[in-house]
């Protein structure tokens, strides 16, 4: 059980989105401009990075906490801070 819990803590969810660009910057979902290579924290527990592809399109990648089933005897414990420290962890009773 302990190994399973530790494995889950290292899994993340990632996305890549083609985004509007102006003057060589990515525009995020809140309308804020970001330079290529810049990383920023999302509204929730997530992290984003702006990049430009070989074809000249601007994208940002987003990485967030995984969602997974929690065994009935366990629960999710909320965390704070920047990604990935803010991702919840699974807490189970000692065996």
Curated annotation (Swiss-Prot):
This protein's GO CC annotations: extracellular region
- State the post-translational modifications: Contains 4 disulfide bonds.
* Superkingdom of origin organism: Eukaryota
Tagged with keyword Signal = yes
Q: Which GO terms describe its molecular function?
A: toxin activity
The answer to whether UniProt assigns keyword Cell inner membrane to this entry is no
Q: Which InterPro entries match?
A: SVWC_dom
What is one Pfam family matched by this protein? SVWC
Principal subcellular localisation of the protein: secreted
The record's account of tissue expression is:
Expressed by the venom gland.
TM annotation in the entry:
none
Region forming the signal peptide:
1-16
Location in the cell reads: Secreted
Keywords in alphabetical order: Disulfide bond, Secreted, Signal, Toxin
Which family does the record assign?
Belongs to the scoloptoxin-16 family.
User: Mind telling me what this protein is named?
Assistant: U-scoloptoxin(16)-Er12a
> Source organism lineage?
Eukaryota, Metazoa, Ecdysozoa, Arthropoda, Myriapoda
